[in-house]
Amino acid sequence: MRKKILSIILTTTMVLGLIPCIPCVNQVKAESSWKLVWSDEFDGDSLNTNVWTRETGGSGWGNNELQYYTDRTDNSYVSDGTLKIVAKRENYSNCRFTSARLKTAGKKSFKYGKMEARIKVNGGNQDGVWPAFWMMGEKGKWPDNGELDIMEHANDRNYVGGCIHW
């Protein structure tokens, strides 16, 4: 009798232990009523400046960032249907690194919708590298207008996260 009870308890524990392994998130499928309002497939030979702005500066952006964001095609360019953003170790305007910071602010904004992007980041141990895909509020100034971090890949530590700042 004791063996039977112990067997039932162990079996139940094992089954309950497997529950977290069952996927609980279903991929959102587009409703037939949804319509595409904007996309950029980067299929030209340059960045579409009617939609994108290369933000420039080396002020740290409130995050103590060490790079200078340039508008140079060395740091951001379109090739083979993809947008490439390249960080470089180089002295530039009192900074030791350069990169690109691109935004659609003032050119594209959305109140509701599904946002989607294909993003590939380089591998390796790269301290300080922080690729991200964000959405910022249209009205007011940050941080009062909110921020939706769809993807942040901090320091390439096998971590991809998202966050809502409100």
Model-predicted regions and their roles:
Residues M1-L10:
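Bacterial N-terminal signal peptides that target proteins for export
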Residues M1-R2, Q27, R118:
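Generic N-terminal leader/processing signal
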Residues I5, P23, L66-Y69:
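Generic alpha-helix initiation/capping and coil-helix boundary signal
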Residues L10, M14-L18:
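Hydrophobic core
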Residues L18-S32:
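Sec-dependent signal peptide cleavage junction
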Residues E31-W166:
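GH16 jelly-roll
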